[in-house]
């Protein structure tokens, strides 16, 4: 592992079992961990201004290389002074490599991400070929052919000026067989070297690079990937690829992956953000999580809530919420709950498709996640993380579980 103070440092303050509280020091300020990272997929967190996201307490967001390559393009963002200046965000930014999106076009699963682009674009997005050089695909905006390679991914992320760039990898689906997964993992490792070579020669000063662990649900392939990434000149590790068909299999995959990673390295779990998954992931020693769950739920009229039997969510559009004068969650400090907006009102504006409903629900969900992680950090420092996790899983709100 590389430890270049000019790029990024990771300091561990407290431990409680395998859970740990720390700080990622980036060129744009500290990020307290464990941390949940909201998605600013196209340069904004859906429904929120950058100032509002920071006001909730977030210190880092994730930008999407694939979407920002398609539009508005890295050159336009670079001319604006980089993604920080472009979106008015002066704290840390991590960018993914674009690999998940282009491979989802081939393997399925990207449709949910690009729904906001309009129905007319669905048929345009298509992967044309996966080669050693990279991946050829069609833009979902205009059907033009684009190429994303390890070098191009790093070039785009350099132009965006993120604090942390992720290497280009192939994200295999669960249904890929072992033989394909093995070939894919080996290719990801070759692409890792190409990413690092490009970044070493051309990368912007201060930009850290995280490697990505692949290997599917195969313990030997995961172990091999951990060894390759751990030996490389990277600043941290992200765990990607399929984690199984259900939460039990995900726990199993993480259980034999995380112990094979360097203890001092910051560990990032890609694309996972359910409340119970975060609680379990922190207990395993993971530090950073990103996911579209808070904003995706809000778009569909759902709010996070301390309801383990209901997957920690409320559907405010349901008829039973009409006439309910209670807040989404008692004592929640979000704009919806603290602002006096009842479930009854949120039911009405959600069912009538008012933009205010999405904004209030996004604010609530992001606040809930931020307080969940804040509580986890405090519990780790107090040596009480197991108790905190049990209370969350039993139905306590984050602000009541400490």
PLM region descriptions:
Residues 1, 186-189, 196-198, 202-328:
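Glycine-rich phosphate/ribose-binding loops and adjacent secondary-structure elements
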Residues 153, 184, 188-191, 195, ...:
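Alpha-helical packing segments of well-folded alpha/beta enzyme cores
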Residues 29, 61, 96, 157, ...:
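Conserved, mostly hydrophobic/aromatic
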Residues 1-25, 31-35, 47, 168-175, ...:
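C-terminal extensions of enzymes
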Residues 173-178, 182, 236-242, 355-358:
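Glycine- and acidic
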Residues 1-203, 314-322, 340:
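Non-catalytic, usually N-terminal nucleic-acid engagement modules in DNA/RNA processing proteins
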Residues 105-107, 327, 349:
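Short conserved micro-motifs at the rims of enzyme active sites and ligand-binding pockets
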């Amino acid at each position: 592992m590389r430890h270049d103070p000019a790029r990024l440092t990771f300091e561990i303050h407290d431990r409680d079992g395998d859970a740990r509280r720390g700080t990622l020091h980036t060129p744009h300020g500290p990020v307290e961990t464990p941390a949940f990272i909201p998605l600013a997929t196209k340069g904004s967190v859906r429904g929120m201004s950058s100032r509002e996201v920071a006001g909730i307490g977030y210190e880092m967001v994730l930008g999407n290389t694939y979407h920002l390559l398609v539009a508005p393009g890295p050159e336009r963002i670079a001319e604006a002074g980089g993604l920080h200046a472009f979106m008015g965000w002066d704290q840390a930014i991590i960018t993914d490599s674009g690999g998940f999106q282009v491979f989802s076009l081939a393997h399925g699963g990207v449709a949910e991400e690009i729904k906001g682009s309009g129905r007319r674009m669905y048929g345009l997005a298509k992967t044309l070929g996966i080669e050693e050089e990279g991946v050829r695909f069609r833009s979902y905006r205009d059907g033009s052919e684009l190429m994303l390679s390890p070098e191009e991914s790093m070039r785009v992320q350099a132009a965006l000026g993120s604090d942390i760039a992720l290497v280009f990898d192939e994200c295999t689906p669960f249904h890929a067989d072992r033989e394909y997964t093995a070939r894919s993992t080996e290719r990801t490792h070759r692409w890792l070297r190409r990413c690092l070579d490009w970044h070493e020669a051309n990368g912007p000063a201060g930009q850290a690079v995280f490697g990505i662990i692949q290997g599917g649900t195969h313990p030997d392939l995961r172990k091999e990937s951990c060894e390759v990434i751990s030996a490389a000149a990277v600043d941290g590790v992200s765990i990607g690829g399929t984690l199984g068909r259900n939460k039990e299999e995900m726990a199993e995959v993480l259980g034999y992956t995380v112990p094979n990673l360097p203890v001092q390295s910051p560990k990032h779990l890609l694309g996972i953000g359910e409340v119970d998954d975060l609680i379990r992931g922190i207990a395993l020693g993971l530090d950073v999580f990103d996911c579209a769950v808070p904003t995706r739920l809000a778009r569909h009229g759902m709010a996070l809530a301390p309801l383990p039997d209901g997957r920690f969510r409320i559907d405010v559009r349901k008829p039973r919420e009409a006439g309910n004068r209670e807040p989404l969650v008692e004592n929640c400090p979000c704009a919806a709950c603290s602002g006096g907006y009842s479930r009854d009102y949120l039911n009405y504006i959600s069912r009538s498709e008012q933009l205010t409903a999405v904004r209030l629900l996004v604010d609530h969900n992001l606040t809930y996640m931020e307080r969940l992680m804040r509580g986890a950090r405090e519990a780790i420092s107090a040596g009480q993380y197991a108790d905190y996790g049990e209370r969350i899983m039993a139905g306590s709100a984050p602000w009541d579980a400490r």
